[in-house]
Amino acid sequence: MGKNEQKDPNVYFFVPNLIGFTRVFLVLISLYFMSWHPNYCTIVYLYSSLLDAFDGWAARKLHQATNFGAILDMVTDRCATSCLLCFLCAAYPKYAIIFQLLVSLDLASHYMHMYSTLHQGASSHKTVTKKHNWMLRLYYGNNKVLFIFCAANEMFFVALYLLSFTPRTPPKLGYLPVPSFIYSTGELPLSYPTLLAVLCGPICLAKQIINVVQLVNAANALVKMDVEQRRAAKKLQ
């Protein structure tokens, strides 16, 4: 190797990717605690989610944005949320089909959106243009909006996770009588998880609407690409 030749950098050891690997490790730890220690699980899970904001910042700050890092980030998000929703299926069997649909919607919408944007020549699945729906432009075009929606979405599911455990001590605010289809015991504890669920629930619902819009937008883009390819093929015949 000549003196002027430089060795290719090891992308795996870029700072944003190391943060990504740390997130994966923390998610695995949270899964270990998930069924029997909600406090440990919640702390580790939320710490992993918090790091999601730092890997992107590090990538921009250190000029270490990579294709691998972008995919690692998205896959980690999808897998972590899916694992939590799988637990909620067992914790709330009456609503299992809802959580199953949420997992399916989350995976399908993000995969199809990524596939369509990259096939249209975009450098990232977060790249949106005027052709995209206004909701997607607002969602992906503003990092603060993206963070709020993603954080509230995760916090709502975490709140449901915490509520699935019987509190060791009675909540200071007492209990609220509710129908059994809302809470199995008929008495909803007025605790921090309850307040968190109430605050984050509407944003979580909006996030699911965005996922539907994202799915439809990606499907339309892929169909348009198919039509254009078939037209081009006919011209060559």
Swiss-Prot record:
Disulfide bonds: none annotated. Mg(2+) 1 binds at D52, D55, D73. Induction: Expression is regulated by both growth phase and inositol. Expressed in the exponential phase of growth. Addition of inositol to inositol-starved cells results in an immediate increase in pis1 expression. This is CDP-diacylglycerol--inositol 3-phosphatidyltransferase. It is a multi-pass membrane protein. It is found in: Microsome membrane; Endoplasmic reticulum membrane; Golgi apparatus membrane; Mitochondrion outer membrane. It is an enzyme of class 2 (transferase). GO terms for cellular component: endoplasmic reticulum membrane; Golgi apparatus; Golgi membrane; membrane; mitochondrial outer membrane. A CDP-1,2-diacyl-sn-glycerol binds at G56, R60, T66. GO terms for biological process: phosphatidylinositol biosynthetic process; phospholipid biosynthetic process. Keywords: Endoplasmic reticulum, Golgi apparatus, Lipid biosynthesis, Lipid metabolism, Magnesium, Membrane, Metal-binding, Microsome, Mitochondrion, Mitochondrion outer membrane, Phospholipid biosynthesis, Phospholipid metabolism, Transferase, Transmembrane, Transmembrane helix. Catalyzes the synthesis of phosphatidylinositol (PtdIns). GO terms for molecular function: ATP binding; CDP-diacylglycerol-inositol 3-phosphatidyltransferase activity; metal ion binding. Belongs to the CDP-alcohol phosphatidyltransferase class-I family. Its cofactor is Mn(2+); Mg(2+). Its EC number is 2.7.8.11.
